[in-house]
């Protein structure tokens, strides 16, 4: 269960990073 949550959190972080990159552009 914990591993699943971690994966979900990582995915969300990755998504946020992508958005930040676009904002910088």
From Swiss-Prot:
InterPro entries: Ribosomal_eS32 (IPR007836)
Pfam family, one: Ribosomal_L41
Biological processes, Gene Ontology terms: cytoplasmic translation; translation
Domain of life of the organism encoding this protein: Eukaryota
Primary localisation category: cytoplasm
Region Disordered: start-end pairs: 1-25
GO CC list: cytoplasm; cytosol; cytosolic large ribosomal subunit; endoplasmic reticulum
Assigned keywords, A-Z: Cytoplasm, Ribonucleoprotein, Ribosomal protein
One MF annotation (Gene Ontology) recorded for this entry: RNA binding
Residue stretches in coiled coil: none
Localization in the cell: Cytoplasm
Keyword presence, Cytoplasm: yes
Protein's job: Component of the small ribosomal subunit. The ribosome is a large ribonucleoprotein complex responsible for the synthesis of proteins in the cell. Interacts with the beta subunit of protein kinase CKII and stimulates phosphorylation of DNA topoisomerase II alpha by CKII.
Family according to the record: Belongs to the eukaryotic ribosomal protein eS32 family.
Note: Initially thought to be part of the large ribosomal subunit. Crystal structures show eS32/eL41 to be a small ribosomal subunit forming a bridge at the interface of the 2 subunits.
Description of how the protein assembles with itself and partners: Component of the small ribosomal subunit.
Protein name as catalogued: Small ribosomal subunit protein eS32
Taxonomic source organism: Homo sapiens
């Amino acid at each position: 269960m914990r591993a699943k949550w971690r994966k979900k959190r990582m995915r969300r972080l990755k998504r946020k990073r992508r958005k930040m990159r676009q904002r910088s552009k």
